[in-house]
Amino acid sequence: MSVRILLVALLICLSHGSASCVGREVAVAVSESGDAFIVQATIRPPVSPRTAWEVLVDFDHMTGILSNLTASRVVSRNGNVLIVRQEGIARFGIFSYPFKAEREIRMEPQRRILAKNLSGTLKRMESEVRLIPSGVGGVRIEYRAEFAFDSIIAGLFGVSFLNHEVEEQFQSIVAEMKRREAQAASDPLQPNR
């Protein structure tokens, strides 16, 4: 590799901060496809697969994890299929986007979570979360979602808006995963909530 390429890479790293150059915990990409936005994210939390799973499916306590949620509860449970109702306000710059969602959640414990919007302020939303074993006792989370908005403003700023929201939400989720993992390590007899 030439010195010139190394210098350019170093300048990019310095201008974006060290997190861009050293294994980021949350990486998000958003693209447009017709009337929808496709979100893909890779999350590398430094926690066990079990802790990651417990946080991802803790819908009844999600308001304590995600600051943009004002309500989150499981309204129906049938084995590994849940109906979850959530409300909140997403903020992006000077804009805010109040939302409501009722979603069907299908879980394959410790492996996969499928979500589909049944009703709410989004025109359409479907997502898949996959937990993939990584390293010794670690986990990598792959997230893919498709969003279609009813709001013109949300649609206009969709790529930037979703990139901001998804990255912020997964950073909060990773912080909760770390908190619970540390709590479990310090006192294995206490529940992780």
Regions found by a protein language model. Name each.
Residues 19-79:
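Hydrophobic ligand-binding cavity/cleft-lining segments
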Residues 32, 44, 73-121, 171-192:
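Glycine-rich portal/gate segments that line the openings of hydrophobic small-molecule binding cavities
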